[in-house]
Amino acid sequence: MDRASENRRLAAVGKPVPGIGEMGNRRPLRDINNLVGAPPHPSAIAKKPMLEKSGKEEQKPALVVSHRPMTRNFAASLTRKEQLDHQVSVADAAVVCTDPQKNPIPDGTVDDDVESCESNDYIAVDECNDTDEDESMMDIDSADSGNPLAATEYVEELYKFYRENEEMSCVQPDYMSSQGDINEKMRAILIDWLIEVHHKFELMDETLFLTVNIVDRFLEKQVVPRKKLQLVGVTAMLLACKYEEVAVPVVEDLVLISDRAYTKGQILEMEKLILNTLQFNMSVPTPYVFMRRFLKAAQSDKQLQLLSFFILELSLVEYQMLKYRPSLLAAAAVYTAQCALTRCQQWTKTCELHSRYTGEQLLECSRMMVDFHQKAGAGKLTGVHRKYSTFKFGCAAKTEPALFLLESGAGGYNLQKQPC
């Protein structure tokens, strides 16, 4: 029934019509004082219900939104509101639990909740521990799954082959005793000079390690007079460049870098002699091959990478380091660099898995590397130290050595000895 017919019916029976004055004129419907006759306007907010006689507290009604699309922002705001309400309720419960004298609690109510909260906390800790274990055994090749050059499908088989054949690149640690005219110090001078030549020509890292390997394998099998020792080093670098580099230095450049001590013909003759002595076996695993893998397992940044290579190149100069396998030298260099940067003994399970060495197995070699690091800037053979003191190599030589590894010699290997 419309409002006009209702007014006519009331007027017919003699009842006053709401909203009509003595002159019979209706007030404007939108006048703020005319509330009686105004039509009810639909409201989006529900009215509060009346309190029941039972005395229960009135609960806060939920906000009912009409004709509101469920957008992402709106759903996120509702979720945040529910989380805040839940946090407030948990905080209130915690306050009640911590002060039982002021807030007496019936048996079997909040205590059960507290016990369940404590059990959930323990579960959360266990889950964190499981997560740490999972992260410590991470898949280091997952990021390169789409890179065909990484060869992730058979990279494990490659390094298994390298480990099985790294003995081919090793020499007897006392081969210098068979040399009558040269000694360990002369070898150190030669290697230090070759590192400077390598830096001068801006050659690849693998070229340097292959050069040193060729020198040692040749000196093990061939007696060399003192005046031809530098010739062996220059020719070994030429062979390594032909094997590793794209642009090979010309022989004339090597003649100039050696201050014309040898001719082009002498270098070519020595090249034939070295190849025949080594039976043309140039493809041997060097410490560089393993270094790349172990740095990847350690999730290295640029700083760790440069410091690891600095420590490893210091070991190339030292004759006494020939007793260690190439894989162990690379692993010990990464381990020593990590200890120097973090100031604690650090060797993750992932590094142990891919290197096949534990921290305890690396400790002896690592202590020797720390000693080399400490004395790198002193003495006459400072080529490696000057190279890694430049900005190009991150001033890695200026990093403080991990001297605490030397101090822990009596106590043995202890991962928790120095807190991180």
From Swiss-Prot:
GO biological process, one term: cell division
SUPFAM superfamilies hit by this protein: Cyclin-like (SSF47954)
Record's keyword annotation contains Cell division: yes
Chain intervals for the UniProt region annotation (Disordered): 1-61
Induction: By gibberellic acid (GA3).
Record's compositionally biased regions (Basic and acidic residues): 49-60
UniProt xrefs under PROSITE patterns: CYCLINS (PS00292)
Family under the similarity heading: Belongs to the cyclin family. Cyclin AB subfamily.
Record's function text: Involved in the control of the cell cycle at the G2/M (mitosis) transition. May activate CDKB2-1 kinase.
Stated name of the protein: Cyclin-B2-1
Lineage: Eukaryota, Viridiplantae, Streptophyta, Embryophyta, Tracheophyta
Name of the gene encoding the protein in the UniProt record: CYCB2-1
